[in-house]
Amino acid sequence: MCGIVGAIAQRDVAEILLEGLRRLEYRGYDSAGLAVVDAEGHMTRLRRLGKVQMLAQAAEEHPLHGGTGIAHTRWATHGEPSEVNAHPHVSEHIVVVHNGIIENHEPLREELKARGYTFVSETDTEVIAHLVNWELKQGGTLREAVLRAIPQLRGAYGTVIMDSRHPDTLLAARSGSPLVIGLGMGENFIASDQLALLPVTRRFIFLEEGDIAEITRRSVNIFDKTGAEVKRQDIESNLQYDAGDKGIYRHYMQKEIYEQPNAIKNTLTGRISHGQVDLSELGPNADELLSKVEHIQILACGTSYNSGMVSRYWFESLAGIPCDVEIASEFRYRKSAVRRNSLMITLSQSGETADTLAGLRLSKELGYLGSLAICNVPGSSLVRESDLALMTNAGTEIGVASTKAFTTQLTVLLMLVAKLSRLKGLDASIEHDIVHGLQALPSRIEQMLSQDKRIEALAEDFSDKHHALFLGRGDQYPIALEGALKLKEISYIHAEAYAAGELKHGPLALIDADMPVIVVAPNNELLEKLKSNIEEVRARGGQLYVFAEQDAGFVSSDNMHIIEMPHVEEVIAPIFYTVPLQLLAYHVALIKGTDVDQPRNLAKSVTVE
């Protein structure tokens, strides 16, 4: 959600800002803007409703010169998408961009109006601009004004502030919304995502909760909310510079679907040794903590929640550990009973998901045994604040609809299951089967991807549909959930998923010739039960699309389409059966002409409630 880029240098920074915004487009937005100040203090601001390209065209028509600037892509929360609501916002010489939500913006707005300030937008961000302006009028430096203003804000914010009268400094503050500083030679940068800054630096400092940073061309000083200076470690990024390049693919989502075999290989690299899972990266004390685990609580949102749901079956059936999975936004607002020796596992692609972070922080107060983050972004808030962390190493994922982040999360979770089964002293064949399955997984997915044309042809049947139903049983039920989520996200078809055994309890009423029913049916002990559910749909004239192995015993007919799958090891079947559902959603969206990579109303990383 939303994107921030800032730069302070001797050279003109407008193109750096625009390129940074282009690299953040995947996060979702409805408007874009930037402001640049030259050495004499002349400020130029441009804002446009729509895509970054429209802003870039405006910058060509009205060239911006100056070595200090901030830029933003907005995803509307307070105030409709419009040019007047687009960032940056200005209060005389104070210029502000902001991600997040200021919960007390209304009383602050009234106070500032009483002091003579006029508001021209509907946004909560304009409150920050006027508030900093007011505090600066009370005396002191911009940093001192920001230190006085920030405690007055309630809510989540990542904000960057500049004063056109003093273009040698940027101020930034972070509470609940990520900011990262990029370190250069005689120039420095700031953004909401390190991907925005990879063209200009690979050295980064991640701001921590409550940090306030003062950035000049030659220095970065960081303070806590009391004004005391603090030190933050800088890291070298391992992200690829060309992560934002689609290459031969039409969309990022398509590229990321096809990257899954290599992404999973990267996830496994260095983690399997002598036929066992090796998670020594967790540190020397991890085994002691993990051996005490008697219960697992998983928190996640969206696609990550679905991966947690799959892993619940694994933790309980393979490692013998009770497991609960909860949507993070629900967990954080209810009173919950903590099970004895319960490990909190959080799942997030970005590591900045607001509700998941809040749930992690709450778990520390509630007395969980420990916390483990499974994440795709090293150095993210979730990773820094957890006791243990495992990286998925999927590479940058840009498409809003998650694909490779999901399958690599499942890969890491399955390795963790193997590790816990060994620590619990269970039969060594459990770990052996997991390792064997994971090692085979990349080639199995490559086999599946070779059948893309079959899925593409199948997608034609969905082009005029408004609803779809997905069914699965056991650990394939969450895969049905994920398939439905993918279809609704990018094709805008209303899709729901049910455990197939629930058909008689309501969903069967929906079945008719206009309701496509997608079934994931691998060869396992639930296949015969699933066949009975399929017959219930068939008897009522539903259009069935069944993904099953050749020897599963299904026969195609006018209303039952069998999509034959290659044989796959049972333990990795949930990961494998995800891929055809990703392809189906992608091709249906293509036919319907939707924006595959940036579907309406959605953002890649949800960093506010």
From Swiss-Prot:
CDD domains: GFAT, SIS_GlmS_GlmD_1, SIS_GlmS_GlmD_2. One of its GO terms (molecular function) is glutamine-fructose-6-phosphate transaminase (isomerizing) activity. One of its GO terms (cellular component) is cytosol. It is found in: Cytoplasm. Its main location: cytoplasm. Its EC number is 2.6.1.16. Pfam families: GATase_6, SIS. The active site is at C2, K604. Keywords: Aminotransferase, Cytoplasm, Glutamine amidotransferase, Repeat, Transferase. The keyword Repeat applies. PROSITE patterns: GATASE_TYPE_2, SIS. Residues 286-426, 458-599 form the SIS domain. It comes from the Bacteria. Residues 2-218 form the Glutamine amidotransferase type-2 domain. GO terms for biological process: carbohydrate metabolic process; fructose 6-phosphate metabolic process; protein N-linked glycosylation; UDP-N-acetylglucosamine metabolic process. The keyword DNA repair does not apply. InterPro entries: GATase_2_dom, GFAT, GFAT_N, GlmS/AgaS_SIS, GlmS/FrlB_SIS, Ntn_hydrolases_N, SIS_dom, SIS_dom_sf. HAMAP family: GlmS. Homodimer. NCBIfam families: glmS (TIGR01135), PRK00331.1 (NF001484). PANTHER family: GLUCOSAMINE--FRUCTOSE-6-PHOSPHATE AMINOTRANSFERASE, ISOMERIZING, GLUTAMINE--FRUCTOSE-6-PHOSPHATE TRANSAMINASE (ISOMERIZING). This is Glutamine--fructose-6-phosphate aminotransferase [isomerizing].
